[in-house]
């Protein structure tokens, strides 16, 4: 109907859709001209990324997080601080990677739980640090007392009493589900974490989209936004090579070209005669830019400055002519001219 806005259905959460959203966000952050301009666009993009991750998280963990948001009452009363420790069953499952399961790739799983429960979730205790050498160095120091305890998950929240209890209850339920190992090959959460890690590292490949669609380079887009670039010719089309100028001049001659002297015609005093121009002798009828040395200006070295004058006075410029002396020129003296030799 006229006047009604068409509402498009949201795309289903999938790894391919999440990869496209992350690529668009990376593109926006890589272009300096777009940073801070489209504020609402960046906010909507972040909200869509969080929605897709949440739905994928729910589907992969079989209802790990309730799809309904927390229903919190109005904040009444003072702010309280609550904390809870959930110990990890490392003795029952010594080879299971609970820390990686709780934190996720680059801490995304823990951040997802924090955003949905409103609690702070941290892994503490022995073997909670990736660098074992650094863990041994910090053991016994102030603020590192938790390294003497068994591996556990620390959940903290700050809110009014009623709201804090609701948040803590939800967080404890979700973390307890993470502490139950899944069978090998049936851990959907692990599959999702590996997929997210591949997307973040740029190694994830979409199997449903054709290769030309995936051939999208962020570096090329950033370079195109900063300045012009050369456009390559389409495959199969090669530009013809530029033809060279023929060596013979074309067009009406403007001035005569000096031909080389002939040694056979020499005057008695040794001066060679000039060869008369022939009909085909001419010059090039074209612009001087094709032959850069044809009409080159006289070099300054051909005008030596006389240094005998006073400093600051005008110097006399003397033109230097490079006349070629004939190698077989005969010098005729007065006595030889009289005798005829």
UniProtKB/Swiss-Prot annotation:
Keywords: Cytoplasm, Developmental protein, Differentiation, mRNA processing, mRNA splicing, mRNA transport, Nucleus, RNA-binding, SH3-binding, Translation regulation, Transport. Residues 87-153 form the KH domain. It is found in: Cytoplasm; Nucleus. GO terms for molecular function: mRNA 3'-UTR binding; mRNA binding; SH3 domain binding. The keyword Transport applies. Its main location: cytoplasm. A motif (Nuclear localization signal) lies at residues 324-330. It comes from the Eukaryota. GO terms for cellular component: cytoplasm; nucleus. It holds the Pfam family KH-I_KHDC4-BBP. GO terms for biological process: 3'-UTR-mediated mRNA stabilization; mRNA transport; negative regulation of macrophage differentiation; regulation of astrocyte differentiation; regulation of mRNA splicing, via spliceosome; regulation of smoothened signaling pathway; regulation of translation; skeletal muscle tissue development. A motif (SH3-binding) lies at residues 276-279. SUPFAM superfamilies: Eukaryotic type KH-domain (KH-domain type I) (SSF54791). RNA reader protein, which recognizes and binds specific RNAs, thereby regulating RNA metabolic processes, such as pre-mRNA splicing, circular RNA (circRNA) formation, mRNA export, mRNA stability and/or translation. Involved in various cellular processes, such as mRNA storage into stress granules, apoptosis, interferon response, glial cell fate and development. Binds to the 5'-NACUAAY-N(1,20)-UAAY-3' RNA core sequence. Acts as a mRNA modification reader that specifically recognizes and binds mRNA transcripts modified by internal N(7)-methylguanine (m7G). Belongs to the quaking family. PANTHER family: PROTEIN QUAKING-A, RNA-BINDING PROTEIN RELATED. Homodimer; does not require RNA to homodimerize. This is Protein quaking-A. The gene is qkia.
């Amino acid at each position: 109907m006229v006047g009604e806005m068409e509402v498009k259905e949201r795309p289903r959460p999938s790894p391919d859709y999440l990869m496209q959203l992350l690529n668009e966000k990376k593109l926006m952050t890589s272009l300096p001209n777009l940073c801070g301009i489209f504020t609402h666009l960046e906010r909507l993009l972040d909200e869509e990324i969080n929605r897709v991750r949440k739905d994928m998280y729910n589907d992969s963990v079989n209802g790990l997080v309730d799809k309904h948001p927390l229903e919190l009452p109005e904040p009444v009363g003072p702010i309280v601080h609550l904390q809870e420790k959930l110990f990890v069953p490392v003795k029952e499952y010594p080879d299971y990677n609970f820390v990686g399961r709780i934190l996720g790739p680059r801490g995304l799983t823990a951040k997802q739980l924090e955003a949905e429960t409103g609690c702070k979730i941290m892994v503490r205790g022995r073997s909670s640090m990736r660098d074992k050498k650094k863990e041994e160095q910090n053991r016994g120091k102030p603020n590192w007392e938790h390294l003497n305890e068994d591996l556990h998950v620390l959940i903290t929240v700050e809110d009014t009493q009623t709201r804090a209890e609701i948040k803590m209850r939800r967080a404890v339920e979700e973390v307890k589900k993470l502490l139950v190992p899944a069978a090998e090959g049936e851990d959907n959460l692990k599959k999702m974490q590996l997929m997210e890690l591949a997307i973040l590292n740029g190694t994830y490949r979409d199997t449903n989209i054709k290769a030309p669609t995936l051939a999208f380079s962020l570096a090329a887009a950033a370079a195109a936004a900063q300045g012009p670039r050369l456009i390559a010719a389409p495959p199969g089309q090669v530009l013809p090579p530029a033809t060279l100028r023929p060596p013979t001049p074309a067009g009406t001659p403007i001035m005569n070209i000096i031909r080389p002297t002939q040694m056979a015609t020499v005057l008695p005093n040794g001066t060679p005669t000039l060869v008369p121009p022939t009909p085909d002798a001419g010059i090039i009828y074209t612009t001087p830019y094709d032959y850069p040395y044809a009409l080159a200006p006289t070099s300054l070295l051909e005008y030596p400055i006389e240094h005998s004058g006073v400093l600051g006075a005008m110097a006399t410029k003397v033109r230097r002519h490079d006349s070629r002396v004939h190698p077989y020129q005969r010098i005729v003296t007065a006595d030889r001219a009289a005798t005829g030799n």
